[in-house]
């Protein structure tokens, strides 16, 4: 009898412990942070001032390891072992985010950055931040934004991830196992500190400027593929060059394109920002080799913002990239191929800026609409990750995730922010209701978001202030057989999405703020 009492007591203690753990890990990290901003400036236009800055967020690789079977997975049970370089008798890995678990970095190929462009019209100050990361969760973004609002004073801050798959895990799901986070807490704090410093420096660097805006909407089609039907891309390159209004010197640039920075693929073990590194460098310094200069750079600091990458947009090893200097076709997953890709993109952006179609403005006003929204968490794997603390993300209400959207207008430039990886058909059109769909419905996410945006230059900032995963048209959702287009298995995407309501909610919410 006494034994049964002890068992029951232990069971009750276990239930209490689990309940406390669940409530703690699912708590709203920022219950005081809810956005509903409307800055619709209808007054006199004024001079635009702009500032740029960048700060490194490259991790220190203290220990390396020996990958005996070359599969880019640290597997001690199969003979892999680490090199205790710092002599502390334990393995101190930096887990790379993207592709698969247990991929510790072996070194650094090129630096990672927090890069910032600040726009100021005299009334409203907007900070646009890009960090070289696979993703940055809303709660962590809010940590930075609260500090910025308190100590720097920007009216609105956008923190977008490049979604590079060769940088440290800042989400948690690419650690040593499915049940242990891959986030290094010290590195996370370093990223936050450096990002705040970059924003502060950019604000201090603000000077009156003119903006030169250009785009090439089709030239980059050969450098990206859609790995899921329907075949819909978002291939347009859009670029803003900011020049000191007095000296004509380039302060910096913001360039956007839509593709997964994963050209180096799954067996790369060196920290890198992938093709954005070469893209930014080409814009800043030009496209050249030891013999030939194909295009002069514009100088300044280039900020890369990713776009509609869902679907997913990729440059896989079998997709060739032509060398810009010769007839070589680069295949596989190499740095030469990744460099060629970045240089080709840089050429397109630079040529667009130098074309007769580029526009210039020196005066405008910033209009802004931003709003907190909630989306149901309908993904068992994500929920388990939240509960176990593998993903350090809170919920509100009955398993809802809090996130954010925004719409910005600066002269002919319009911007919408997306808190994840949106499918291009939601942005540009082409949502379908194919055979095999899980929900027997017509397309919901219509009309396309870009068709509702004003201005000539329509930027879509993906993974902005959050990374909620794939944002899939509900009429294309497919987890159970029969599968879409009579395929033999379900497509990739749903496994890394909050759920089927994410697409409709994001679309309707952005439509609402665009109609404001």
Where are these regions (language model features)?
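Conserved beta-alpha junction segments in alpha/beta enzyme cores
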Residues: 4-9, 18-161, 167-329, 333-340, ...
């Amino acid at each position: 009898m006494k034994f049964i009492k002890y068992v029951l007591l232990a069971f009750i203690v276990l239930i209490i412990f689990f309940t406390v753990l669940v409530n703690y890990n699912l708590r709203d990290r920022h219950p005081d942070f809810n956005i509903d901003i409307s800055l619709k400036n209808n007054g006199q236009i004024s001079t635009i001032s702009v500032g740029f800055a960048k700060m490194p967020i490259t991790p220190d690789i203290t220990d390396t390891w020996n990958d005996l079977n070359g599969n880019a997975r640290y597997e001690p049970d199969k003979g892999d072992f680490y090199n205790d370089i710092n002599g502390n008798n334990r393995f101190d890995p930096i887990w790379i985010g993207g592709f698969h678990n247990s991929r510790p970095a072996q070194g650094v190929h090129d630096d990672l950055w927090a890069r910032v462009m600040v726009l100021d019209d005299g009334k409203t100050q907007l900070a646009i931040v890009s960090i070289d990361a696979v993703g940055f969760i809303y709660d962590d973004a809010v940590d930075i934004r609260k500090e910025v609002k308190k100590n720097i004073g920007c009216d609105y801050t956008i923190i977008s991830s490049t979604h590079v798959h060769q940088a440290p895990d800042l989400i948690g799901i690419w650690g040593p196992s499915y049940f242990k986070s891959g986030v290094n807490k010290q590195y996370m704090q370093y990223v936050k500190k450096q990002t705040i410093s970059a924003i502060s420096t950019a604000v201090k660097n603000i000077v009156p400027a003119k903006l030169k805006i250009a785009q090439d909407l089709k030239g980059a089609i050969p450098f990206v593929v859609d790995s899921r039907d329907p075949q819909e891309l978002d291939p347009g390159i859009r670029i803003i060059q900011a020049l000191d209004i007095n000296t004509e010197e380039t302060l910096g640039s913001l360039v956007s394109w839509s593709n997964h920075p994963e050209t180096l693929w799954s067996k790369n073990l060196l920290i890198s920002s992938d093709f954005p590194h070469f893209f930014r460098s080409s814009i800043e310094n030009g496209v050249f080799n030891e013999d030939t200069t194909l295009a002069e750079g514009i100088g300044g600091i280039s900020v890369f913002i990713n776009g509609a990458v869902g679907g997913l947009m990729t440059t896989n090893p079998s997709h060739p990239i032509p060398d810009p200097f010769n007839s070589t076709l680069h295949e596989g997953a190499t740095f030469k191929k990744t460099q060629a890709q970045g240089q080709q993109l840089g050429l397109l952006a630079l040529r667009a800026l130098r074309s007769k179609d580029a526009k210039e403005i020196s005066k405008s006003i910033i209009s802004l609409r931003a709003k907190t929204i909630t989306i149901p968490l309908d993904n068992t794997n994500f929920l388990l990750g939240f509960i176990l603390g593998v993903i350090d993300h809170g919920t509100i209400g009955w398993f809802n995730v809090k996130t954010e959207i925004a719409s910005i207008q600066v002269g002919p430039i319009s911007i919408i922010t997306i808190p994840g990886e949106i499918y291009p058909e939601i942005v540009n059109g082409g949502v379908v209701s194919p055979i095999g769909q899980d929900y027997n419905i017509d397309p919901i996410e219509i009309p396309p978001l870009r068709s509702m945006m004003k201005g000539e230059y329509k930027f879509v900032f993906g993974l902005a202030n959050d990374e909620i995963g794939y944002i899939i048209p509900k009429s294309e959702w497919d987890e159970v057989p029969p599968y879409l287009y009579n395929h033999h298995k379900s497509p990739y995407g749903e496994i890394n999405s909050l759920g089927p309501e994410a697409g409709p909610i994001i679309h309707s919410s952005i439509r609402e703020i665009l109609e404001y």
